[in-house]
Amino acid sequence: MLSVVKPLQEFGKLDKCLSRYGTRFEFNNEKQVIFSSDVNNEDTFVILEGVISLRREENVLIGITQAPYIMGLADGLMKNDIPYKLISEGNCTGYHLPAKQTITLIEQNQLWRDAFYWLAWQNRILELRDVQLIGHNSYEQIRATLLSMIDWNEELRSRIGVMNYIHQRTRISRSVVAEVLAALRKGGYIEMNKGKLVAINRLPSEY
């Protein structure tokens, strides 16, 4: 079974090779588009620092993650027809280079194994949202999202509002999300502070 743990060792090898040829960038504001597949489909983007959100068509939120992250690693071989965007959630730095050059460098430096690990992990993450949400009722979707959020480190959780994240990820109405969160807090199942998730004590399987 593929691990959902980010393959940092493999990222390090790829970054060491690619960074020498990349054009640096820095974003200092939130909600700036770093990568858009309909504009940047011939480039590979490597995020070195910062928090980013990954969104699909119609601004559907797939998830939020901290650097490091690579987008467009395989675009030099096959174009991605699904429109994705990477959005900065604060200060963000990294670099980009032509996707075809990325493939050439991977070939020259025999980094196919590392590239495969990264792409396998990325595909698993992209699938995870659909696995957690499709075919489940509103509470089950909220529950799954809370469980995914508690796996974030404390710094990331302190930056992301629970209600907005759940609403954008699931498309469940804010009123329903607020009602469920209030009930879970009242029952002592979750702990929140200023709208941020602090802890999960236990989540009932049904609401």
Swiss-Prot record:
Q: Which domain of life is it from?
A: Bacteria
Disrupted-gene phenotype: Deletion mutants display increased resistance to oxidative stress and increased catalase activity.
Under InterPro entries, the record lists: cNMP-bd_dom_sf (IPR018490), HTH_46 (IPR041687), IprA (IPR034719), RmlC-like_jellyroll (IPR014710)
Q: Which UniProt keywords apply?
A: Stress response
SUPFAM superfamilies per UniProt: cAMP-binding domain-like
Q: Which GO terms describe its biological process?
A: response to oxidative stress
Gene3D superfamilies linked: Jelly Rolls (2.60.120.10)
Spell out the Pfam families in the cross-references: HTH_46
Q: What residue ranges does this record give for the DNA-binding region? A: 163-182
Q: What does this protein do?
A: Involved in oxidative stress resistance.
The similarity comment for this entry is:
Belongs to the IprA family.
By what name is this protein known? Inhibitor of hydrogen peroxide resistance
| Source organism of this protein record | Escherichia coli (strain K12)
